[in-house]
């Protein structure tokens, strides 16, 4: 499906942060007083084997779900806001044409050795005309994919390929000028779909000013869409607010947060662009840690977080470097407190040296191993 990317600044090498919002990936939970008392029980030699087994099981139950535990245990099932309590979702943006999304998703999954949890797609706000359906949320292909995946729908206030006059503005959206033909129509489509979906409005909004309006205009437009959905009885949307996470935009990002009552998840998109923006090579940790800590300190200290796009350019002089980068992902991810989803961007950005897709078999094999980690394999139901 065709889509336009907003201009995205690269992420400069971050300054050192205290890491106060990060957790030790190797930290284990306390067994609790009940388990400790049971361990202190005196048992007879005739029952030692069974008693030890009972104590071990009690210890596990008292500790709660183990970080990264997979399976169908009731306490690892997703919450009402689609949070996986025992780990994190793995998803991706998979390049596709209008009609072949299911096939492209299956091909990606075959290559990476597992099913995706979240499939990420993009839409504009154009009106349906003839065969055009870029503005149609939940296409037939998305519905097919959604039978056994979660969907993240990115909805942009654009008319791709349209005239300047056709481009929606945040002020128009906030004033309700798009309600009848756009907002209400798509709200009803989502309501009819029934299953919960992640929905993002104007991702990377900090790159869209002043062309689309002011930060205040964005907040009003976002809140209007949210309130309009609620008025129409749409209760199966998980509202996902996605910024670049580029810290030179920190003031702008803070102004564009719609508020805790309007946001369920907070996402950010950080990459190792390398030569794409003539930047130095950044590890996965360097692309994530500073932004993660800033968001926890300045936007929300408790909302679930999503690495809504992550990835790296390749290094032509060191073909193994991309593979080494992806190998770091599980270990770093476990230390990012509150991060409950990570979506790989398997495509390119505009510009020379800006192909962020997996470049070779070694990179694919590395990602395959990384996303086989139990932490990234959680029950969808």
What are these regions (language model features)?
Residues 135-156, 271-313, 372:
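Glycoside hydrolase catalytic-domain groove-lining segments
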Residues 79-96, 197, 304-381:
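Substrate-binding cleft of secreted/luminal carbohydrate-active enzymes
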Residues 37-62:
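Secretory targeting and sorting signals
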Residues 130-241:
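Substrate-binding cleft of extracellular glycoside hydrolase catalytic domains
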Residues 115-124, 153, 253-283, 345:
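Aromatic- and acid-rich polysaccharide-binding/catalytic face
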Residues 80-178, 312, 344:
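N-terminal substrate-binding region of glycoside hydrolase catalytic domains
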């Amino acid at each position: 499906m065709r889509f336009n990317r907003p201009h995205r600044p690269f992420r400069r090498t971050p300054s050192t942060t205290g890491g106060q919002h990060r957790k030790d990936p190797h930290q284990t939970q306390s067994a609790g007083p009940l388990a400790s008392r049971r361990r202190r029980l005196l048992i007879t030699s005739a029952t030692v084997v069974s008693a030890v087994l009972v104590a071990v099981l009690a210890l596990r139950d008292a500790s709660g779900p183990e970080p990264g535990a997979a399976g169908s245990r009731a306490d690892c099932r997703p919450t009402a806001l689609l949070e996986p309590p025992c780990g994190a979702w793995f998803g991706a943006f998979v390049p596709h044409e209008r009609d072949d999304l299911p096939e492209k998703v299956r091909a990606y999954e075959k290559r990476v050795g597992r099913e995706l949890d979240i499939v990420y797609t993009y839409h504009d706000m154009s009106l349906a005309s003839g065969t055009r359906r870029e503005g149609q949320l939940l296409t037939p292909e998305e519905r097919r994919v959604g039978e056994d995946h979660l969907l993240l729908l990115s909805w942009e206030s654009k008319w791709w390929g349209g005239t300047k006059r056709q481009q929606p503005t945040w002020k128009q959206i906030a004033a309700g000028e798009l309600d009848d033909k756009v907002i209400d129509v798509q709200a009803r489509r989502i309501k009819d779909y029934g299953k919960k979906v992640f929905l993002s409005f104007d991702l990377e909004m900090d790159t869209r000013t002043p062309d689309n309006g002011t930060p205040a205009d964005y907040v009003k437009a976002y809140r209007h869409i949210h309130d309009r959905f609620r008025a129409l009885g749409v209760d199966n949307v998980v509202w996902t607010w996605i910024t670049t996470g580029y810290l030179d935009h920190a003031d702008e990002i803070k102004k564009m947060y719609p508020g805790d009552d309007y946001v369920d998840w907070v996402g950010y998109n950080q990459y190792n662009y390398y030569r794409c923006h003539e930047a130095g090579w950044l590890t996965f940790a360097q692309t994530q840690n500073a932004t993660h800590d800033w968001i926890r300190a300045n936007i929300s200290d408790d909302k679930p977080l999503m690495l809504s796009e992550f990835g790296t350019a390749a290094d032509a002089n060191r073909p193994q470097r991309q593979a080494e980068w992806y190998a770091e992902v599980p270990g770093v991810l476990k230390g990012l407190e509150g991060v409950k989803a990570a979506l790989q961007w398997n495509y390119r950005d505009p510009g020379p040296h800006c192909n962020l897709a997996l470049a070779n078999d070694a990179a694919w094999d590395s990602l395959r191993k990384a996303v086989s980690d139990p932490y990234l394999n959680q029950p969808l139901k």
